[in-house]
């Protein structure tokens, strides 16, 4: 009898421990939900996994650590970089931005002086937009693309790069280069990316930017200047130097909508040929307590919910959206 009582008591204690653990886990989950609700926390990157289906079922991960999920194939990752000109299926049209760019090109081809300024945040799609316009001009005029950076920001180095691209004799300053442009013989297109690298918030930085803008105005009959600049620097230069006055057209690349981002990502994934499914998440404990019997309105379609949160996390920035996608994607092996 004593042994039976001891067995029952041990069983009850084990059940109590298990119940306590379950209740403790639920309480901790509720506390986290309440805290996140009060703080208004947004989902973190990777909150849900994207399961990219592929045909290799051997289970051999490509990462060095076998405990980590297999990394995405390089060919898949390349689809979420800059749009190659040959893959038109990846490009999502933005007619409200492309039309004014084409108009500037047509105006300049008709021998009228003009220049194009493209303003937008980093990752907003300025380069892709200009690439599409450049593709339409291909074969008509020589096009030279110059990307500025820390290694290429001083006036002397930029002038040297401009001379090398256009075949002009060496020039050490913007004013000297402007005097050499008539000697080039023929018209051409110059695309200057990351133009904000020329600007420094000092008197010398303002002078250098002013000299560059004077170069654009003095040579826009022989050179079609297409200047790409980040939005914060453009805002300062509009105040200090009246930046838009030096360009016939200013195109501002805005943040995109969630619908545009979803279409862009799905079209790129479709080209890969891989399958796709979204991992459904469990409803938070707070929502389960509020609506214990109506789960349909708590858990929408996982894919739809994922893209809604993606729009909020990337704030309409295309580059960030593509990076978040690659960070969240996992091979389904």
Model features per residue range: what roles?
Residues 111-131:
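Walker A/P-loop nucleotide-binding motif
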Residues 113, 120, 197-205, 209-241, ...:
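Sensor-1/coupling segment of RecA-like P-loop NTPase cores
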Residues 115-117, 137-152:
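Conserved catalytic segments around the Walker B and adjacent sensor/switch elements
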Residues 152-172:
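Conserved NTP-binding/hydrolysis module of P-loop NTPases
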Residues 177-209:
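Conserved P-loop NTPase "ATPase switch" module shared by AAA+ and STAND
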Residues 251-303, 312-313:
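Conserved small helical "lid"/interfacial subdomain of P-loop NTPases
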């Amino acid at each position: 009898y004593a042994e039976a009582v001891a067995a029952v008591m041990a069983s009850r204690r084990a059940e109590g421990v298990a119940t306590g653990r379950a209740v403790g886990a639920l309480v901790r989950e509720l506390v986290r939900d309440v805290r996140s609700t009060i703080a208004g926390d947004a989902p973190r990157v990777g909150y849900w996994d994207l399961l990219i289906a592929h045909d290799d079922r051997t289970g051999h991960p490509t990462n060095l650590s076998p405990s980590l999920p297999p990394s995405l194939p390089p060919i898949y990752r390349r689809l979420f970089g800059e749009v190659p000109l040959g893959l038109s299926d990846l490009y999502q049209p933005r007619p409200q931005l492309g039309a004014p760019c084409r108009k500037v090109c047509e105006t300049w081809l008709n021998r009228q002086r003009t220049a194009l300024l493209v303003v937008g945040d980093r990752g907003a799609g300025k380069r892709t937009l200009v690439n599409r316009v450049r593709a339409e001009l291909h074969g008509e005029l020589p096009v030279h693309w110059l990307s500025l950076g820390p290694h290429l920001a001083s006036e002397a180095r930029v002038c040297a790069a401009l001379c090398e691209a256009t075949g002009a004799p060496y020039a050490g300053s913007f004013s000297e280069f402007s005097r050499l442009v008539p000697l080039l013989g023929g018209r051409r297109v110059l695309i200057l990316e990351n133009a904000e690298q020329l600007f420094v918030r000092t008197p010398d930085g303002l002078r250098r930017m002013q000299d560059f803008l004077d170069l654009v105005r003095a040579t826009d009959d022989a050179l079609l200047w297409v200047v790409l600049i980040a939005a914060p620097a453009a805002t300062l230069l509009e105040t200090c130097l009246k930046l838009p006055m030096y360009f016939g057209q200013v195109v501002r690349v805005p943040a995109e909508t969630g619908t545009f981002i979803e279409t862009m990502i799905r079209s790129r994934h479709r080209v890969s040929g891989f399958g796709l499914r979204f991992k459904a998440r469990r409803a938070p404990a707070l929502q389960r307590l509020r609506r214990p019997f109506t789960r349909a309105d708590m858990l929408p379609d996982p894919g739809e919910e994922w893209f809604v949160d993606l729009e909020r996390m990337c704030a309409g920035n295309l580059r960030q959206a593509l990076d978040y996608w690659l960070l969240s994607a996992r091979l389904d092996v």
